[in-house]
Amino acid sequence: MASVSLLSALAVRLLRPTHGCHPRLQPFHLAAVRNEAVVISGRKLAQQIKQEVQQEVEEWVASGNKRPHLSVILVGDNPASHSYVLNKTRAAAEVGINSETIVKPASVSEEELLNSIRKLNNDENVDGLLVQLPLPEHIDERKVCNAVSPDKDVDGFHVINVGRMCLDQYSMLPATPWGVWEIIKRTGIPTLGKNVVVAGRSKNVGMPIAMLLHTDGAHERPGGDATVTISHRYTPKEQLKKHTILADIVISAAGIPNLITADMIKEGAAVIDVGINRVQDPVTAKPKLVGDVDFEGVKKKAGYITPVPGGVGPMTVAMLMKNTIIAAKKVLRPEELEVFKSKQRGVATN
């Protein structure tokens, strides 16, 4: 009798609905019948999105439009940046988007970099433009991000896109936060009225993730209608734990290995790991990538979890491709774009 009861309980855990009529086990989960978290495959989800983008690109071209073009500016010789850019250009080729990488030395002046951006802004053949971050210390990253034309800003970092996002209006969404949103949405994890903790408040990742999850879902862009708590470097870990232990969804984007451990997570919570940290493998003594979450410990308690690598990273690249086809279709509101172009020409606007 005890074994029958155990099997019944396990069946209830695996099959209970999580969003509407969707069962617990969704496509793109790496799961077996076991009493631990469903591991969400970001690679498989990203492949699905890239297939959607590829179809959209081919339909766009078949309608008589030019093939979308993505320009990437890469400054310096940071190996990680070179690897990220290569992943982006490979993905572009995969979905039928033309791309180019413009490499600048680490010694490039800020003004020279800004001039290159202006030329690409004015190039009608360029639909999407991104400058790979981080940049050398002598270059103001915020100034560079704001120099990219908002309608070509596939990173979603321009102040106009950030502002529109905060106002529940259509904008280019930052790729990583949008990727996190798509993981949650496509996995069927409910957000309406749920408690969410976002560890990390960076302007490019943590803050926009929180914005997407807490905002009204009735507007033009994604909105999760969740109750969101944001922590940061000055949040004591014990204080963080008081929030995460109550959270239905925990998203860590702090860049701190083992920040989130099993004792901080409530049973069945969804844990999304955005962290990318390079540490030394204690067995091989070689460098390896880990996230912010103690993966092995947390997956025994959580309901869903993303791995590092293979979780959020591939989704970031996929959403960049989605932003590029959006940029090619020129759907940004013309009034904001005209203000930006007037300022670039040095024309005063009211």
UniProtKB/Swiss-Prot annotation:
Disulfide bonds: none annotated. GO terms for biological process: formate biosynthetic process; tetrahydrofolate interconversion. Its main location: mitochondrion. PANTHER family: BIFUNCTIONAL METHYLENETETRAHYDROFOLATE DEHYDROGENASE_CYCLOHYDROLASE, MITOCHONDRIAL, C-1-TETRAHYDROFOLATE SYNTHASE, CYTOPLASMIC-RELATED. There is a cross-link at residue 50 (Glycyl lysine isopeptide (Lys-Gly) (interchain with G-Cter in SUMO2)). The keyword Transit peptide applies. Its EC number is 1.5.1.15, 3.5.4.9. Belongs to the tetrahydrofolate dehydrogenase/cyclohydrolase family. Substrate binds at residues 84-88, 131-133, 309-313. Keywords: Acetylation, Hydrolase, Isopeptide bond, Magnesium, Mitochondrion, Multifunctional enzyme, NAD, NADP, One-carbon metabolism, Oxidoreductase, Transit peptide, Ubl conjugation. It catalyses: (6R)-5,10-methylene-5,6,7,8-tetrahydrofolate + NAD(+) = (6R)-5,10-methenyltetrahydrofolate + NADH; (6R)-5,10-methenyltetrahydrofolate + H2O = (6R)-10-formyltetrahydrofolate + H(+). Its cofactor is Mg(2+). InterPro entries: Aminoacid_DH-like_N_sf (IPR046346), NAD(P)-bd_dom_sf (IPR036291), THF_DH/CycHdrlase (IPR000672), THF_DH/CycHdrlase_cat_dom (IPR020630), THF_DH/CycHdrlase_CS (IPR020867), THF_DH/CycHdrlase_NAD-bd_dom (IPR020631). One of its GO terms (molecular function) is methenyltetrahydrofolate cyclohydrolase activity. The modification N6-acetyllysine is found at residue 50. One of its GO terms (cellular component) is mitochondrial matrix. Homodimer. This NAD-dependent bifunctional enzyme has very different kinetic properties than the larger NADP-dependent trifunctional enzyme and is unique in that it requires formation of an enzyme-magnesium complex to allow binding of NAD. Residues 1-35 form a transit peptide. NAD(+) binds at residues 200-202, 233. This is Bifunctional methylenetetrahydrofolate dehydrogenase/cyclohydrolase, mitochondrial. It comes from the Eukaryota. Although its dehydrogenase activity is NAD-specific, it can also utilize NADP at a reduced efficiency. It is found in: Mitochondrion.
